[in-house]
Amino acid sequence: MVENEIAMNVKRFFVAFAALIVTWSVSYADGFRVEWKRTAMDRSRTGVTVASADNVKEAMGEVRCGKYYAPNGKVFRKGVTKKVASVMIGAQPKMADVKQIVAYSTSHMVSHAPESALSDWFIDLLISKCSELTGKRVDVGFANFGGIRVEMPAGDVLLDDILSMFPFKNKLCYLELKGRDIRVILQQMASEGWQVIGGVRCVADKAGNLVSAEIGGEPLDDEKVYGVTTVDFLLDGGDGFHISRNALDVQILDKYVIDVVLPHVKSLTAEGKPIEYQVDGRVKIVK
């Protein structure tokens, strides 16, 4: 009976206890989709915030002598709040690894179409790392907004933040495409919805027509061969894209996205540098 009571009240408890909740999103081949987003929660009942590895007591309170002492000073002697607090606080030592601070971000960055600081930072990093790993020139990058699952917080960035941001087993890829095939991809984005792009500057109208595209400061050349990076999810059907169609070369690298992003943010920290980025107007929508 007690276990059933706890299970039935966990959701209600989180509204009072948690600083935020993360809802997972999964896409299936039949089109069924569950959205994944962060939602700010009311923590007025307990004052709980998200704990890092070294501030569990300050962030979540403590259970002592059969009572739960919440961060806001309230004391709970019984009830589901005390019971779930005991479970959550007791689990924190096992979560210590993902609560490590791995970076510092100068601003809160979100991911949204047609472009955003977080998505620009992400795809430009993939372009740089793909070139480094392959030794080839990479002119253009494509990714999907759905592959960036949560926002970049301002201030301390936890390992958990980065792992939650890029949770999918998407591998980095290198392709060679003619300009005309890149134009087809960009036109699809202009008409169906922009995804993450790098190395290219586009102008589109509100009717969904690609007006112009430049790569390296030059107009997109339909006959020129360009180096392209993307993730394997988008090669043949993911989110409706077939980026490998007509490719002259396709290499699926032995690197997951997280294996590119995480070492990079750790190296920034080791060098005393923060994560910081700004949009640069790579996608412009005109009337």
Predicted feature locations:
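Feature captures C-terminal
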Residues: 31-73, 116, 120-287
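Acidic/histidine-rich, surface-exposed loop or edge segments in extracytoplasmic proteins
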Residues: 95-113, 241-247
